[in-house]
Amino acid sequence: MATINQLVRTPRVKQVVKSNVPALEACPQKRGVCTRVYTTTPKKPNSALRKVCRVRLTNGFEVTSYIGGEGHNLQEHSVVLIRGGRVKDLPGVRYHTVRGALDCAGVNDRKKGRSKYGVKRPKS
């Protein structure tokens, strides 16, 4: 425990919190342009072809973003909205594309969890 004199001389140092999503710059989402759309494989023990895209953001950052849901319509030069949120089995992927916003269409025939995949309520 520090004495009051010691604290007067040098105050306590605040711990600096490092952001998990630095490219968003404290914004909820950011817009960007796809520079490359491709598939990649997850790390062990999982096996799949995960759909990801490389995105150049409006603030100049270039990040890798995961495309969730079954099927997508993205290609090079598509304008997308990205949000934070990493993919645990893809190293270096710290962002998600927002489905149903800008050029990224929602998931077809999605019935459950629709809000996460940009799907409107079906006509009963």
UniProtKB/Swiss-Prot annotation:
GO terms for molecular function: rRNA binding; structural constituent of ribosome; tRNA binding. Belongs to the universal ribosomal protein uS12 family. Coiled coil: none annotated. Keywords: Methylation, Ribonucleoprotein, Ribosomal protein, RNA-binding, rRNA-binding, tRNA-binding. The modification 3-methylthioaspartic acid is found at residue 89. InterPro entries: NA-bd_OB-fold, Ribosomal_uS12, Ribosomal_uS12_bac. CDD domains: Ribosomal_S12 (cd03368). The keyword Transmembrane helix does not apply. Part of the 30S ribosomal subunit. Contacts proteins S8 and S17. May interact with IF1 in the 30S initiation complex. One of its GO terms (biological process) is translation. This is Small ribosomal subunit protein uS12. It comes from Vibrio atlanticus (strain LGP32). GO terms for cellular component: small ribosomal subunit. It holds the Pfam family Ribosom_S12_S23. With S4 and S5 plays an important role in translational accuracy.
